[in-house]
Amino acid sequence: MSIFDVLTASAEMMPSHYKDMSTGEMEKRVAAIKRAFGKRLFIPGHHYQKDEVIQFADTAGDSLQLAQVAEKNKEAEYIVFCGVHFMAETADMLTDDNQTVILPDMRAGCSMADMADIQQTDKAWQELQELYGNTIIPLTYVNSTAEIKAFVGRHGGATVTSSNARSVLKWAFKQKERILFLPDQHLGRNTAYDLGIPLTEMAVWDPVQNRLLTDHPENIKVILWKGHCSVHEKFTAENISQLRQRDSGIRIIVHPECSREVVSLSDDSGSTKYIIDTIEQAEPGSKWAIGTEMNLVQRLIHSHPDKQIESLNPDMCPCLTMNRIDLPHLLWSLEQLEKGEPKGVIKVPEAVRTEALRALNRMLSHT
């Protein structure tokens, strides 16, 4: 489902009166429904969710953690996924047929995932096969549609997360000489660089021009799809320069969805879980600037008052589509379950699911 499809989805919209309810009343109702359903209901929440939502999550995590939890949970009849569309798709594919996955707001998409559609990817693969022959293995960030995961699974590849990208890339290079990395060029570039692959052996594939942007294709080992995260691309070298001038003692940690320039100028980089763990283990009184989604940064600020924490970009805003999952939508979704009329059910077609699972399972077996 593209971001346009998500934003214009014909799925039933939440009645407007939910927006008029007090926070206290909504929280009381959500808590009551959770108690009534017990283990029949499971609510996973991504770290980028608002506090008003994450307080009701049965588990909070990054994309890898939530994928693993979804796969292991066999008790819940309903999984109300507080994340974005591709995450709910992944949960549906990893859970059993008797489990129903629900997204509280079907408009909660991901612009990065939509930067690689299946038609463009098929065309790119044909061109790359003509150029390189059978020397390429595709990998896709889990921030991708089920169809892209299925494409990767069909061609012997695997999914990756920011937590395990390094280990999966190592595995992939044992399979083939070259990698096609979808859809986030920055995570692909940063991970490959950390493995010792020079930038001169990487090139961007432009899906609009349908060509590889290099004058020396024979040197290329990593083909990077021209996609990015609209949140993490807003962190810049200028942000870092201004911060260093203001406070030379501050440490900067960023997510690898940031550009290569930003990552190279930072003190550290890693997955959402890595960032959280690093801050938790940091010395009291230490100073940190964090380059990732604002809801998580604010949560870290509030939960670690003994440390000085700020956003690397003071003008950063939260992820727009992730924030479509709010307390009113969560309550509406749960009340529909209570009525026996679930809305926002996510169901990946079986043919797509079978091939996408190959890619997901290859990842999970190397994690």
UniProtKB/Swiss-Prot annotation:
Cofactor(s), names only, from the UniProt record: [4Fe-4S] cluster
Matching Pfam families: NadA (PF02445)
Keyword terms of this UniProt record: 4Fe-4S, Cytoplasm, Iron, Iron-sulfur, Metal-binding, Pyridine nucleotide biosynthesis, Transferase
Domain of life of the source: Bacteria
Functional pathway: Cofactor biosynthesis; NAD(+) biosynthesis; quinolinate from iminoaspartate: step 1/1
Enzyme class: transferase
PANTHER family recorded: QUINOLINATE SYNTHASE, CHLOROPLASTIC, QUINOLINATE SYNTHETASE A
One annotated Gene Ontology cellular component of this protein: cytosol
Catalyzed reaction equations: iminosuccinate + dihydroxyacetone phosphate = quinolinate + phosphate + 2 H2O + H(+)
Disulphide-bonded residues: none
Gene expressing this chain: nadA
UniProt EC number: 2.5.1.72
Protein name as it appears in the record: Quinolinate synthase
Binding site for [4Fe-4S] cluster: 110, 229, 319
